[in-house]
Amino acid sequence: MGKPLIALGLEGSANKLGVGIILHDTNGSAKILANVRHTYITPPGQGFLPSDTAKHHRAWIIPLIKQAFAEAKISFKDIDCICFTKGPGIGAPLNSVALCARMLSLIHKKPLVAVNHCIGHIEMGREITGAQNPVVLYVSGGNTQVIAYSEKKYRIFGETLDIAIGNCLDRFARIIGLSNAPSPGYNIMQEAKKGKRFIELPYTVKGMDCSFSGLLSGVEAAATELLDPKNPSSVTKQDLCYSLQETGFAMLVEITERAMAHIRADSVLIVGGVGCNERLQQMMAEMSSDRGADVFSTDERFCIDNGIMIAQAGLLAYKTGDRCAVAESTITQRYRTDDVYISWRD
């Protein structure tokens, strides 16, 4: 029968630093013991620099680990493995977290497991929602991919050809001076709810791939022209946020539906930070309803980057014998989803 296994997960691929502790019982069920997070937030109009983000992670990771262990009511002797994000992500923050994982592994003599960030999102989403074999729409600040599992890999059926949808939303939020707290995308969503006019913007879909740079350029040009005080236009920034969301999300729904039709899938799972967006969830639900399919998503505890998803995916890999030697515990900024061998699925 074995014994329950416990993993510590460390995530820091962008401006969110997360620490999670998960327990897998002997029957395979998962229990979240702790899931804590701290976000590096910059002033309105500014993004986050890699060096500053890494400094934030170095300052907060030990306090967060202590908080996680206090919530879980366990100690390092109870941990079976330490899981960390190998990539994809921003180099300096990734390195800061990987360095901490190495240090903890050596001090406490616990094995390391390197985890792909996207696989973490998928496996946590599957665990929380119960989705068995969905088409996955992975949407975040750095990634936009349509994914499905086949023959021991999560295959990418479509993706952005340039910038991610989250990056598009974040950059427009900076252009119009929205706050970065709690996140630019959240504030875009709130402004979009007040929008009343739809402004036509560039729409670029190529098969199951899409492009958001033209959309960003288009909405930026519209903002410069229509929001000019000298322009008599009655268009508001709320209208532009609404139009940006409707256009970008329609592109995402189209490529997701095309992938579902291609592989005859009966469900879709939305993961990643942008997956929290209520309008995206609504549009995906309408499409899925028309197809007689199910749509799954999670709340902000699991959509937004977190440590528990790294612990979940890492522990699944650990149980099939996956280990990462300290000497090989490097990071890979462009770590492709389909580069990972999925040993724990049939």
UniProtKB/Swiss-Prot annotation:
Binding residue positions for substrate: 138-142, 170, 185, 277
Its recorded reaction(s) are: L-threonylcarbamoyladenylate + adenosine(37) in tRNA = N(6)-L-threonylcarbamoyladenosine(37) in tRNA + AMP + H(+)
Q: Which cofactor does it need?
A: a divalent metal cation
The EC number on file is: 2.3.1.234
Please give the function described in this protein's UniProt entry.
Component of the EKC/KEOPS complex that is required for the formation of a threonylcarbamoyl group on adenosine at position 37 (t(6)A37) in tRNAs that read codons beginning with adenine. The complex is probably involved in the transfer of the threonylcarbamoyl moiety of threonylcarbamoyl-AMP (TC-AMP) to the N6 group of A37. Pgp2 likely plays a direct catalytic role in this reaction, but requires other protein(s) of the complex to fulfill this activity. The EKC/KEOPS complex also promotes both telomere uncapping and telomere elongation.
Q: Which family does it belong to?
A: Belongs to the KAE1 / TsaD family.
Identification of the protein by name: tRNA N6-adenosine threonylcarbamoyltransferase
